[in-house]
Amino acid sequence: MNVSHNSSIDHNDLAKRGESLIRKSTNRYLTTVRIAFRAKQRRFDDFDGLLEESSIKPVQRSIIELSDEQDQPDLLPG
């Protein structure tokens, strides 16, 4: 799923990604905290661009990012 400022979210895909994150995790609570922490980071990162209204909420964006990282670990730096 391509994440851009002007795209809309496929809610079924988002639900599947969230379910996959939780299903593959060993601790549902920590997964939820990771999603919330990433969303908080993204919210403050996007704070500078207040004039650009994003159609994707920070929690939705964090689920997509964490799901992509889980499914494609070779894309991670380091």
UniProtKB/Swiss-Prot annotation:
Promotes RNA polymerase assembly. Latches the N- and C-terminal regions of the beta' subunit thereby facilitating its interaction with the beta and alpha subunits. Its EC number is 2.7.7.6. It catalyses: RNA(n) + a ribonucleoside 5'-triphosphate = RNA(n+1) + diphosphate. The gene is rpoZ. Pfam families: RNA_pol_Rpb6. Keywords: DNA-directed RNA polymerase, Nucleotidyltransferase, Transcription, Transferase. Belongs to the RNA polymerase subunit omega family. This is DNA-directed RNA polymerase subunit omega.
